[in-house]
């Protein structure tokens, strides 16, 4: 199967689903059997999954150490991951490893322990990210939570399972002008 055929078929493939497995560390995925759904997973000749979705929700992960290596062991084309579900784990930050998946369009991080709203800045490099969840994290309690995320990630069309409207965008822009100070340009003055 060539790469173009793979891209056309894997979008409809069921996810590689490791949800509700009490997984503590990413490396455990290699020895764990994924959950089975109504449709069987398609595999490559090498035995790797032909999907673009990886579900790790409802586990006890507190970091994503070795995520890239494990994804490469499980998926035929890990670089094509489009959907990662890490909801309901024990993550305290947004691991930069997630920013290496440039085809990521759906990222679920709700129900974790992410404290700092500034963690969202890391996701700004993902050009295809359209759907993001962060509710149920301590950061949700910060003033301007929704507006900050929408300002930082202007391509998002769905946030916390709600569509982003034009009014949301306008409110976020007004909030940004009122709350985020622009960086001042330093001008070196000539000394005579």
Swiss-Prot record:
Localization of this protein: Cytoplasm
Placement of LRR repeats on the sequence: 49-71, 80-101, 103-124
SUPFAM superfamilies: Outer arm dynein light chain 1
Domain LRRCT: 137-175
Alphabetically ordered keywords of this record: Cytoplasm, Leucine-rich repeat, Repeat
Additional facts recorded: LRRC51 and TOMT were originally considered as alternative reading frames, LRTOMT1 and LRTOMT2 of the same LRTOMT gene in primates.
Protein name (Swiss-Prot/TrEMBL): Leucine-rich repeat-containing protein 51
Organism annotation: Pan troglodytes (Chimpanzee)
Encoding gene per record: LRRC51
